[in-house]
């Protein structure tokens, strides 16, 4: 899965079978706030979202960002994937 950081739209995005799947974000002081997941009908499968989030975590490591999970679904991703907990800012407990 190839992920594009569309800074203009403030979202990480990918195309699957010609359909756009994205995670919207806002950015502040080396923290990225993941604010919304956009998944078209037929792509609600957790595998797609998990793969997209795994790729976003790789980008966060590369850019030395901390990740603030605003959505319950993204907080659940952190609980299921404790290897990414070091990306959480100090004081954020999941």
State the predicted function of each range:
Residues 38-44:
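A short, internal acetyl-CoA/4′-phosphopantetheine-binding micro-motif in the GNAT/acyltransferase core
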Residues 2, 22-24:
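Short, surface-exposed charged micro-motifs
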Residues 1-11:
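Active-site rim helix/loop that mediates acceptor-substrate recognition in acyltransferases
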Residues 45-53:
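Glycine-rich acyl-CoA binding loop
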Residues 27-35:
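A conserved beta-turn-beta hairpin within the catalytic core of GNAT-like acetyltransferases
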Residues 10-21:
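Conserved beta-hairpin
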Residues 56:
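Aromatic/hydrophobic pocket-lining residues that form π-stacking "cages" and hydrophobic walls in ligand
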Residues 59-94:
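C-terminal structural segments of small proteins and small subunits
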């Amino acid at each position: 899965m190839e992920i594009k950081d569309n800074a203009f739209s403030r979202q990480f995005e990918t195309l699957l079978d010609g359909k756009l799947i994205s995670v919207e974000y806002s950015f502040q002081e080396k923290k990225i706030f993941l604010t919304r997941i956009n998944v078209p009908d037929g792509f609600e499968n957790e595998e797609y979202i998990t793969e997209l989030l795994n790729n976003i975590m790789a980008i966060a490591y590369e850019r030395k960002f901390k990740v603030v999970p605003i959505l319950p679904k993204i907080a659940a991703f952190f609980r299921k994937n404790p290897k990414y907990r070091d990306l959480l800012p100090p004081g954020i407990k999941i």
